[in-house]
Amino acid sequence: MVALTLALAAATSSAEVLHVRVVDSNQDPVPQVAIYVEQSGTSRAARAPASAVMDQRYKRFVPHILVVQKGAQVSFPNSDVVAHHVYSFSRPNNFVLPLYKGTPPDPVRFDHDGVVTLGCNIHDSMLGYIVVVDSDIFAISNEDGVARLDVDSDAAQWTVHAWSPRFRNTREPLVRTIMAGEALTVTFALEKKLRPSHDDHTESVLWNDYD
């Protein structure tokens, strides 16, 4: 009976594409922004969390920003020839992977939504982020500052969130709300100057953002 109910729910909910664009104060596109959508009023049941990978290559976390659904398990392979000691102080998702090469046998499960800041106890320049969201609809903006997300057409409301370590306020994401019947297009136009990108090797200032 449960399987039949889920099948009927899936059949009555079709997808539409929500377009999100992020631009800075000069109207230039902002890539590598975590975008996720919470929707209400849909008949579709949320998908189960998918596993994900946060690699380490050339003494960098790859990808720099990873978005996962709450409850997802993330593996941390080390593709470098040197050992890494990966950790996060971001409570309640804090964890430690002591000095290792290769791939740890067990992935890390993230059961709480929020931003998880990653570091390496051996290489201080290594900095990465896992954005844990209570949604199965998420993406990263491309080089044009654009993300396209499949949302359920029968939803009554879509709440769109945007987060980047380059935003001046990294504590909370930017939020926009779309109601049923409105255009599925959102532009986040940033008013404040962005922090330098991690490629500039200056983003370590964000270590001070820990609670």
Give the predicted meaning of each segment.
Residues 18-24, 35, 76, 145-147:
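A short, amphipathic beta-strand motif
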Residues 95, 105-107, 144-151:
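Short, surface-exposed beta-strand/beta-hairpin micro-motifs centered on an aromatic residue
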Residues 12-25, 194-199:
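A short, Gly/Thr-enriched small/hydrophobic beta-strand-prone motif that recurs across taxa
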Residues 101, 133-141, 166-185:
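Structured interaction patches on ligand/partner-binding surfaces of diverse proteins
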